[in-house]
């Protein structure tokens, strides 16, 4: 039987592009893992993706995961858009190149091991775990320690 895991995640960027951070909370039964990191120069969307990627990459065995995010970009991207992007050589419907391909590929790979359900949460709607992730992501953006090597101006 698969472990049932809840993941809450959020990303933040001060300036967009600018310093950014992500945070996630992983819950399993009474266990809770909270993590966050800050980057010197990145974007909000990259941080939204990174939070979920780092959380799911930390799971070493197949799990049944519910991922809660306030990012429609991430949720719609992985559920609806990615198949067309890949078919069209990573181009959008407007024939421009998809941004953050490096992270979309990492996200897709990190999810392959798991059974995943996506739950969209409206930003700042009072969901305590989402609010906690939002706060930690913003704080991490204020004190960056990492370089986002995949970010290209």
Curated annotation (Swiss-Prot):
InterPro entries: RNase_H, RNaseH-like_sf, RNaseH_domain, RNaseH_sf, RNaseHI
CDD domains the record matches: RNase_HI_prokaryote_like (cd09278)
Chief location: cytoplasm
Annotated positions binding Mg(2+) 2: 10, 134
Residues that, per the record, bind Mg(2+) 1: 10, 48, 70
Superkingdom of origin: Bacteria
Enzyme class: hydrolase
Subunit structure: Monomer.
Protein's name in the database: Ribonuclease H
Organism of origin: Buchnera aphidicola subsp. Baizongia pistaciae (strain Bp)
């Amino acid at each position: 039987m698969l472990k049932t895991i809840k993941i809450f995640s959020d990303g933040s960027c001060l300036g967009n592009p600018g310093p950014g951070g992500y945070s996630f909370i992983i819950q399993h039964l009474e266990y809770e893992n909270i993590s966050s990191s800050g980057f010197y120069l990145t974007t909000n969307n990259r941080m939204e993706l990174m939070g979920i990627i780092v959380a799911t990459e930390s799971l070493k065995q197949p799990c049944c995961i519910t991922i809660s995010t306030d990012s429609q970009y991430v949720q719609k991207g992985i559920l609806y858009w990615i198949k067309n992007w890949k078919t069209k050589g990573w181009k959008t419907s407007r024939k421009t190149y998809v941004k953050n391909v490096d992270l979309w590929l990492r996200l897709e790979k990190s999810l392959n091991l798991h059974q995943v359900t996506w739950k969209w949460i409206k930003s700042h709607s009072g969901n305590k775990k989402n609010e906690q992730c939002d706060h930690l992501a913003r704080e991490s953006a204020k004190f960056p320690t990492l370089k986002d090597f995949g970010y290209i101006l």
